[in-house]
Amino acid sequence: MSQVNMRDMLKAGVHFGHQTRYWNPKMGKYIFGARNKIHIINLEKTLPMFNDALAFVERLAQGKNKIMFVGTKRSAGKIVAEQAARAGSPYVDHRWLGGMLTNYKTIRASIKRLRDLETQAEDGTFAKLTKKEALMRSRDLEKLDRSLGGIKDMGGLPDALFVIDVDHERIAITEANKLGIPVIGVVDTNSSPEGVDYIIPGNDDAIRAIELYMTSMADAIIRGRNNVAGGTEVYVEEAAAPAAE
């Protein structure tokens, strides 16, 4: 199993938290100190927690489980989509729609509509419509693809969520908690770790840090899938106990 090391995290700026006045006391035990009124995250605590999360994800992937990537803020979206696609994982990179997990039946109907429109666009149906109707359907297709394109092949609820910026994605975490879906999350010094089963204390804004998290997670999924033939399947019910306190 490949692991992230301290040098990788330092180069990516994982240790830089938020301004001290915005800190969340629940993250106090992961803070090393402050520099120029910026909290510094204790990477000696982050390192084993990050690697534990990667090991968990690799085991899930080995058991053919689905890990959904969630990162909808501007600095994360593109990286989330790229790495999820590389790992063949579902993702949400634009906006979390309320009920995406807890009302999946309705979401599935919207995914069917998206697939129908994709078929119509490809088979020439749009060309047979009036300009106005074709434009309306094209806009519907674009809107649905933007919202649901990353999960259209998911085929059911995910077995775990990996979240960048737990405050920004609090609705997703709440839905996962209600359904008993494990949550892995990058938690910065201004955020609450509540509802996160596998906490990764770290910078959730810097692009290089986000790239490190996403690339490492995608690599773990790919490794797990490649080891399916020689390993024992591991299911979500057998996951380790939550790390959150």
UniProtKB/Swiss-Prot annotation:
GO biological process: translation
Taxonomy, superkingdom: Bacteria
GO molecular function: structural constituent of ribosome
GO CC, any one term: cytosolic small ribosomal subunit
Pfam family, one: Ribosomal_S2
Keywords: Ribonucleoprotein, Ribosomal protein
Family annotation (InterPro entries): Ribosomal_uS2, Ribosomal_uS2_bac/mit/plastid, Ribosomal_uS2_CS, Ribosomal_uS2_flav_dom_sf
Stated family: Belongs to the universal ribosomal protein uS2 family.
Protein name: Small ribosomal subunit protein uS2
Species name: Pseudomonas putida (strain GB-1)
Gene: rpsB
